Every structure is written in C-alpha cells, then in structure tokens.
Amino acid sequence: MVVRQAERIDQLEAEVAELKRQLGQNSRNSSKPPSSDSPFVKPAPKSLRRRSGRKPGGQPGHPGSTLALVADPDERLRHEPGACDGCGAGLAQAPEVGVERRQVFDLPPISVRVVEHQLVARRCRCGATTCGMAPEGVVAPVQYGPRITAIILYLYVGQFLSKKRTAAALAELFGTPVSEGTVAAVTKRAAAGLDEFLDVAAERIAESGVAGFDETGLRVAGELHWVHCARTDRYTLITCHRGRGQDGMDHAGVLTRFRGVAVHDAWAPYDTYTDADHQLCCAHALRELQAVTDTADPDADWCWAAQAADALVAMHKLITDAIATGATAPDAAIQRALDQQIVFYHSAVQIGVNQTAARTTKIMQKHNALAHRLLDRQDDYLRFTRDWRIPADNNGSERDIRMIKLRQKVSGCLRTLTGARQFCAIRSYLSTATKHGKHFFEVLVMLTEGRPWLPATN
C-alpha cells in the first residue's frame, strides 16, 4: 500500500510539474508568439537582453525627426497687425521690423482626374480607314489608371486592409467607388506581372553565401496553410503551400539548389538539405534555455541552462562589438575570449545531458532532448563564431515573415490558395524593394504601369 501511494504521489507530482511548465510558457521562453501571452498577467522582467548602461529614450547626438521649416513654401500668406498694441494708432505706414514664420503642412483637396483618349478614325482617298492607336495600357472603354490601382495594392497588400475596407477607403478618400471584385482583379493582374521578379529573387537567394529560412501558419479557405520565407539582406521570397515540411520548402524552389549557409530554427525538415551548411538560430535556443531556467530549483546556486545561455550571449556580444569597430575576423585576444566561452557552453550542455539522463518526467525528457541537441549540433549553433558573415539568429527571416501574422490579425484569413499566393508574391516584391531603398508606392506604380521594378544585376 505504501509503495503504491509513493508511486501515485510521484505520478501526481510529475503531472503537476508538467502543468506548471505548460502554464509558464510564454513568448519569452518558447516559440509561442507574443500575441498568445495573457493580457491579464504582467510578465516577470525576464528579457534576454542585457543592460546597455544607457538611459531610456533618445541618445545624445540622435538627429531626431521633427518637422522643419522649408525654404520655399508653396504659398505665403502675410498677416499684418491692425493697430498698435501700445497706443492704438494705425500701422499701415509703419516700418516693418521683423517677420515670424509659421508653416502648416497639409494636403490640398484630392479629386480623381479623368482623361479621355479619343481614337480618331480617318478614311483615305484609297478607301481604307485607319484608326489612331491608344497609349500602352489603355485597353478598355473605362478603366482605372496606374496610380489608383497602385493605391489599391498599397492599402490591400501593403497595409493589410480587407477588400471591403480598401474599397471603402478609395470611395471616402478620393470619391472613387471601387468594388471588392475590382480589388481582387487588380491584385491578380499585379501578381501575374511579377514572374520575372520572382525568378530573379529566387535565383539571387539560391546563389547567396548566407540565407535565412522560416515558416509560419496562415489560414486559407478555413484550413491551416504554411507561408515559407527565404531571404537575404537584399532579397525576400515568400511562398504559400499546404505543407509545412519538405514539400512546402521544395515548392519555394530555393533550398533545393542552395549551397551556402542556411540560417533557421531546429525544425527537422531543414536538415534534409545536406548540400547546405546550417546555422541554427541561437535566439530560439535562448528561449528554450530560459524555459529550463524557469523550471529549475529556485534555491539552486547554478543552472546548466543559464551558463549555456550566458555563453551564447557573450559570444554574440564579442563578435558584434568587434564588427562595430570594423573587424571582419577575430584577432588573438577575441579568439581566446571566444574559445573560453565555447568551453563554458560545451561543459554546461554536457552537464545538462548528464543531469537529465534519467528522463523520468516529461519535463526532464524535454530538457534532455534540448541538451542533447545543443551538444550534438554544437558546430551548427556556433558556426557564426567562425564565419562573421553568418548571423547568430534568424531574426531577419522572422521580421520578413511577421507581416503574415499582422495581415491575419487585421483582416483575417484569405479565401483561396491562389489569392494567398498572389498576396505573397506582391509582399516579396515590396520587401525586396524596401531592402533596396525603394518606397512601396513608387514600385507599385511601376508595377501597375506594366514595367515592374527589378533589382540591379550588380
């Protein structure tokens, strides 16, 4: 009886510990997004960032971004004083002794301008009738011009408004009634004009030495689909597929021919691409290590996960500080410091493997799997210490793909897979253009004019 009670107590304690672990998960110690955090629970201050020593707010020397007076305003209005504030005398003939300038930045009334193209037909003496040619792009009796269609794309794809709200915005801002069907048709035509751009983006990413990869869920036609992102600092390719794994990655067409260093999280299908080297995301590892620390004995003086996390942070700081000074490779002093932190990392995760080897509870099994991964794939986690072109984390990919979640929050799911792929194609175009210093509206006008922007070949 006593033995059975002890076994039952151990089982219940393990269940309680697992439930506490699940309740303790948040965006700081797992892969859960910040939107899943409870709005009613103020999180404890457990930021993975270390103190910088600087005060909050703008730093000394920061240029600021306030409005400034312009030298040549569009209009000048003079406001003369009527009478003297001192004696009440008229000031019409008084000398001018100064002018205070105040400028108001505003928009003029906006209205749509309609241009009619008249195609004149003339009959020659020979009897043949010849008609004038319409300008390129003028193909219907009535149609919207490139700037209006660019605004539709800007609101719908660039700012994530729904079709209904996009149509309402056009009607209210510009007095132009637009149907939801028009928004869909404009998006379809725009995406169809991006085939060459998408081929170029995929090729440039596949040829790069370092590229980031990530994926996130998107509701399409009421079902979960997956958006895949391949990116560099200059190019972005976003695709949508029903599968999260290798089928979806193959559909994007980058990893199948990629020979550089792929930066990604520990999602197993990435490891099937053996022609590439791999840099596993240290930011993900830090969140997992934080989860181990959160469930550790609060009375313990030392935790293997905390030491491993501190070593990763220290290595990253050593490299970023050196790069900030213009260095491209470690000198002897930096290499010694890196080697020391690598020893700290290795010994910590080795102890983690040993401490959790019993795997008697679900928590211990999870922590053991993490420690084994950090140890077995140490080279892939620390590749950034050997080649400073490689980022330690996959934050760039997460930033490029984050807009999918933002779009879903603002306007909900997409109705069809075709529509989702059109959205992803245009977002690839906009993200890449931004990385080249171009503005959304500028490149959208080029796209709707039938001459989509392409990145320079050099």
What is each stretch, according to the model?
Residues 3, 117-123, 128-458:
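Catalytic center-proximal scaffold of phosphoryl-transfer enzymes
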Residues 1-143, 213, 219, 364:
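Short, flexible loop/hinge motifs at secondary-structure junctions
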